[in-house]
Regions:
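Surface-exposed acidic, glycine-flexible loop patches that form ligand/cofactor-binding
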Residues: 29-33, 96-100, 167
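A general alpha-helical scaffold signature found inside nucleotide-binding enzyme cores
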Residues: 34, 61-62, 128, 132
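Mobile cap/lid helix-loop segments that gate and shape the active-site cleft of serine hydrolases
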Residues: 20, 50-98, 104, 125
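A short alpha-helix capping/helix-coil boundary motif
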Residues: 8, 75, 102, 110-115
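Primarily recognizes the serine-hydrolase "nucleophile elbow" in alpha/beta-hydrolase
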Residues: 1-57
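C-terminal catalytic histidine-bearing segment of alpha/beta-hydrolase fold enzymes
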Residues: 106-168
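Extracytoplasmic/periplasmic, Sec-exported soluble proteins
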Residues: 2, 6, 31, 91, ...
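Short, proline-enriched alpha-helix->beta-strand connector loops that line the catalytic pocket
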Residues: 33-37, 100-106, 140-142
Length: 168
């Protein structure tokens, strides 16, 4: 599974989320496992928690509408002010929430150097999202290969990751 930006977030969410299959369903599609063997994400958002993002990346990350529109808030200020209303959905939509020891490996890339805080520019694709995810994956003991332009380089490139992941 792979995706870029919000597609990366969706790919990571599916990679980490518990199986959504309903083995008792009459619908054969709903009986199928939703688990994947791995994911590649490019510039993906790993959390929608505005407080964590502001602390770890800066205000530029939470000002992007993807962070607050995803959960139905009208602005980043509205999201923070009414956090209790949006917290459950924000948490559910965040891939990092679902990381557990039984999850597949992922390979993620962020194409720009990552100053913190973001002074101006594209905070929604900041490498801090990847660093947060890698830290969580290391904590639970699963593979997260992180590439950040001009900084972190994984021991395996994305093509070799795909070959190894699908060879299993």
């Amino acid at each position: 599974m792979t995706g870029d930006s919000a597609g990366a977030a969706s790919s990571l969410w599916l990679a980490y989320h518990d199986d959504l299959a309903d083995p008792k369903s009459k619908d054969p599609v709903l009986r199928q496992s939703s688990r994947v063997c791995g994911a590649i994400g490019l510039g993906g958002q790993t959390t929608l928690d505005p407080f964590l993002l502001e602390k770890e990346i800066g205000l530029a990350a939470i000002k992007h509408p993807m962070i607050w529109k995803t959960v139905g808030a009208t602005s980043h200020e509205h999201l923070k002010k009414n956090w209790e209303k949006y917290k459950a959905l924000s948490t559910e939509c965040s891939p990092i929430t679902h990381v557990t020891k039984d999850d597949p490996p992922v390979w993620i890339r962020y194409g720009k150097p990552a100053p913190v805080p973001v002074i101006k520019g594209d905070g929604i694709h900041h490498a801090g999202f990847g660093r947060l995810l890698k830290k969580k994956c290391e904590k639970v003991g699963i593979k997260c290969h992180l590439q950040v332009a001009g900084h972190e380089q994984p021991k395996i490139n994305n093509n070799d990751f795909l070959k190894r992941t699908f060879a299993k």
